[in-house]
């Protein structure tokens, strides 16, 4: 019995080490993808771009993002674009842009869905952000 317990403890330690290595690898994948995404200036960024830069499959990227960030790469990219719209709206001077222009600039084509997602993310409509300066 003691030999069995000792063997199980060693196996448990091996499993923990393997899980730690997996989590470290996932962290590197997410960091690589995130650094790349943050460095890209435009809206034309796709999950396949993140896969290429991280040198992993879509499935591996999906698992890594869900494990490390708690969301999918698609959701991450959408939120990144929402934040970039918000930055543009906050930086705008009176009359220099519109919500529609900025939404289109960042690849949002369905304005109702865009407004809903924006409000869910920031607690206000994009038009309110444009009117209000921090």
Task: Identify what each model region corresponds to.
Residues 26-30, 77-82:
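Generic hydrophobic, amphipathic alpha-helix propensity
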Residues 64:
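A short His-aromatic
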Residues 1-42, 46-58, 67-72, 87-112, ...:
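Alpha-helical bundle regulatory/interaction domains
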């Amino acid at each position: 019995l003691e030999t069995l317990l000792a063997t199980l403890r060693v196996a448990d330690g091996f499993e923990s080490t393997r899980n730690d290595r997996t989590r470290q690898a996932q962290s590197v994948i997410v960091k690589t993808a995130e650094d790349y995404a943050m460095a890209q200036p435009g809206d034309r960024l796709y999950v396949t771009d993140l896969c290429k830069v991280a040198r992993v499959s879509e499935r591996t990227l999906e698992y890594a993002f869900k494990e490390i960030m708690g969301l999918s790469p698609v959701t991450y990219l959408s939120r990144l674009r929402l934040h970039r719209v918000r930055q543009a709206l906050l930086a705008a001077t009176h009359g220099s842009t519109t919500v529609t222009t900025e939404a289109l600039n960042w690849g949002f084509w369905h304005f109702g869905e865009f407004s809903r997602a924006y409000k869910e993310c920031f607690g206000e409509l994009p038009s309110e952000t444009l009117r209000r300066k921090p």
